């Protein structure tokens, strides 16, 4: 599993050299970006509370180093062609407690 999330409108760096930038440019870029990856498991629905579907991400690498070696549990909602993942508990982001959501729509098969 690999997740890459970037806030729209992240400012470009002044220089054109790859992986370069001022300390301020690099800090802004990191505040606008989150990536993590690792194995995932989907517990049996019979073993979860209220039959809520969950997915558990075992974080092996992350742009937020505090998550490395942890598990991140997400709530799964599937309705028709829509898949939504959300945090189980609120996260504190910029001093504000909030739940995060990611939504995907399954595209029709190309023929």
Curated annotation (Swiss-Prot):
It holds the Pfam family Lipocalin_5. Residues 1-21 are annotated as: Disordered. It comes from the Eukaryota. Pathway: Secondary metabolite biosynthesis. Signal peptide: none annotated. Disruption phenotype: Decreases the production of 2,4'-dihydroxy-3'-methoxypropiophenone and but leads to the accumulation of 4'-hydroxy-3'-methoxypropiophenone. InterPro entries: Lipocalin-like. 4'-hydroxy-3'-methoxypropiophenone carrier protein; part of the gene cluster that mediates the biosynthesis of 2,4'-dihydroxy-3'-methoxypropiophenone. The first step of the pathway is the conversion of acetate into acetyl-CoA by the acyl-CoA ligase ppsA. Acetyl-CoA is then used as a starter unit by the polyketide synthase ppsB and condensed with 4 malonyl-CoA unit to produce the pentaketide backbone. During polyketide extension, the polykedite chain is probably reduced and dehydrated by the KR and PT domains, respectively. This is 4'-hydroxy-3'-methoxypropiophenone carrier protein ppsC. It comes from Aspergillus oryzae (strain ATCC 42149 / RIB 40) (Yellow koji mold). The gene is ppsC.
